[in-house]
Swiss-Prot record:
Region Disordered, residue ranges: 41-105
Encoding gene (name): Olig1
Compositional bias of kind Low complexity: 44-56
UniProt protein name: Oligodendrocyte transcription factor 1
Localization, UniProt: Nucleus
Gene Ontology CC annotations of this record: nucleus
A GO BP annotation: axon development
Organism annotation: Rattus norvegicus (Rat)
Keywords, sorted A to Z: Developmental protein, DNA-binding, Nucleus, Transcription, Transcription regulation
Amino acid sequence: MYYAVSQARVNAAPATMLRPQRPGDVQLGASLYELVGYRQPPISSSSSTSSSSTASLLPKPAREKPEAPLAEPRGPAPESGGARADAKEEQQQQQLRRKINSRERKRMQDLNLAMDALREVILPYSAAHCQGAPGRKLSKIATLLLARNYILLLGSSLQELRRALGDGAGPAAPRLLLAGLPLLAAAPGSVLLAPGAVGPPETLRPTKYLSLALDEPPCGQFALPAGGAGSPGLCSCAVCKFPHLVPAGLGLAAVQAQFSK
């Protein structure tokens, strides 16, 4: 009998907690709610009860989530003084690059013109050019090497001339006609400076100038009409082709003395 009454009280306990009927049950239910920290929602409606209970169970940051403010549209920013200075500096750099490129282009054009002029002088003495294709242009390195060899050849010819003039062979010695034109080696021991040295390759024949040097008399000098005893002379020999001025103090003896030093 006692067990049946106790079981009935246990089964009726939840009902008294949810819906009190007696004052004792109300105090017991209130004290139980205070112990567990649970607040009973007001019994107004089922929807308000469910929403309030859900809101009470959610954490505080989730309940108070602020909305992000809308971004305001930004218009075109006005140009500042720094932007203008940067644009001006960039324009100046572009102008400087154009000037540098123009100067470099001009330098390369001048270099190509100078190399072409050097090729015109070197090609008649280039054996590789005579054997190869005539329309093929020598490279810059090959042209400079040929010019170096040509200069060394002229130096050796001058050494031979010094030795020949130092021996003192008399009037039949080779003559050095100073006309300010390219040097042409006629034979070992004889170097001629003749105005006809610049011409087509077929006209550059050493034997031609050697025969002229042996057959013709020495260069004659006669004073100019308006000149005096110390005035320069006028040479009109067959080797010289056309009259040109020869200083009065620069005869064959003076040339021999200059090269014998």
